[in-house]
Amino acid sequence: QKTPGPQRGTDMKKKILILISILIILIQIYLLSVLAISALYPISHINEEDLSYLRQKTKGINHLMIVAHPDDESIWGGAHLLEEDYLVVCLTNGSCQAREQEFQAALEQTGDVGIILNYPDKILGLRSGWRFQRKSVIQDLEKILSLKQWDTVATHNQDGEYGHIQHRLTHSPALRAFD
């Protein structure tokens, strides 16, 4: 026995609503998972041993560059690195050995010193907004800024060059820590 026309349309609408509801629930579960993992993401903060190492490595270096990712120092600040000696602090990708090696090799070529912190770049495929790490980013940058009186502090612009979220997020704490 066939369902009458108007009834069939109502059944179809119910099925579509159920599918949409299931999809929304799955998206929410995924986003909550990202938030949970982000909150639990292991961060090793700058400690006294790191600061001692940086004090030793930056003797005679009075310029500081703070970037979000390895290669940002070359793309956005390459001219600075060629003109002066810099300590370059990179906030993300401390867990990616290949990027760290490329970063260190680039700095060797320009005679600069660098450190990569391990703030998350992506979590479960989504760009991290450092929601749970912002306070830690500021604290780590404050420690680095307090190492000495820097002649120059260079970082991403407030627009993140082309709107990149982590470039913008690097700009804000760098300025807050510098104030």
Can you say where each PLM-predicted feature lies in the sequence?
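Short, Lys/Arg-enriched N-terminal segments with co-localized hydrophobic residues
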Residues: 1-11
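Active-site rim/loop-helix segments in enzyme catalytic domains that contact anionic ligands
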Residues: 15-19, 27-148, 175-176
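Short His-Asn-centered micro-motif
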Residues: 66-70, 156, 165
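Proline-aspartate-enriched helix->loop->beta-strand connector
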Residues: 145, 149-159
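Catalytic domains of cell-wall/extracellular-matrix polysaccharide-remodeling enzymes
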Residues: 158, 162-178
